[in-house]
């Protein structure tokens, strides 16, 4: 699961970088990482299924259940990273560009999610409940939820004032949704094993 954590983090980072500056090298890297992430997901899930079939003490059974969910969260972060890559490709192929305000919002949101993901992975790796870090993670997720709502509203205003096209609007709103979901999965990961 440690390797999946590293791959999911790297894939998310690279997908964000690709969205803002598309290039074929990054695309190949993300594609390769996604294949490894998919493979690890299948292998680890298969192993966990075998373990869960054994008669385990309650605490071990709880840990296996938590790992099932965590592996799924890593996989989903990879899926959202793939969606972000596709958004970047849509922008590039359609020769679309986002307004300066929209780009600023995207960069702010991306940075917030990356910080939250790093905090969450730290908590996951240490497997120690750190009350201060847990509070920071919860606050970060709440701020991301507030930003998502605020950015959606400001984008709808831009659409109604014809300051951006419907195509740009779809890319922005999809990307915003993917970022919010990555934050949700990161929060799940942070707290997954904290009570074990």
Description of each model-found segment:
Residues 1-196:
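Cytosolic, long alpha-helical scaffolding segments
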């Amino acid at each position: 699961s440690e390797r999946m954590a590293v791959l999911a983090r790297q894939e998310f980072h690279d997908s964000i970088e690709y969205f803002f500056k598309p290039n074929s090298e990054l695309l190949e890297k993300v594609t390769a990482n996604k294949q490894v992430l998919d493979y690890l997901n299948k292998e680890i899930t298969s192993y966990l299924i075998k373990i869960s079939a054994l008669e385990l003490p309650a605490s071990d059974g709880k840990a296996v259940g938590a790992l099932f969910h965590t592996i799924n969260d890593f996989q989903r972060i990879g899926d959202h990273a793939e969606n972000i890559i596709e958004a970047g490709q849509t922008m590039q192929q359609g020769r679309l560009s986002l307004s300066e305000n929209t780009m600023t919002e995207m960069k702010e949101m991306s940075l917030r999610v990356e910080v939250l993901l790093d905090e969450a992975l730290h908590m996951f790796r240490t497997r120690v409940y750190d009350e201060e870090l847990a509070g920071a993670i919860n606050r970060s997720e709440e701020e991301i939820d507030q930003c998502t709502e605020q950015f959606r509203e400001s984008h709808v205003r831009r659409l109604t004032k014809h300051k951006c096209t419907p195509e740009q609007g779809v890319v922005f709103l999809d990307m915003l949704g993917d970022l919010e979901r990555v934050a949700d999965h990161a929060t799940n990961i942070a707290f997954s094993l904290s009570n074990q």
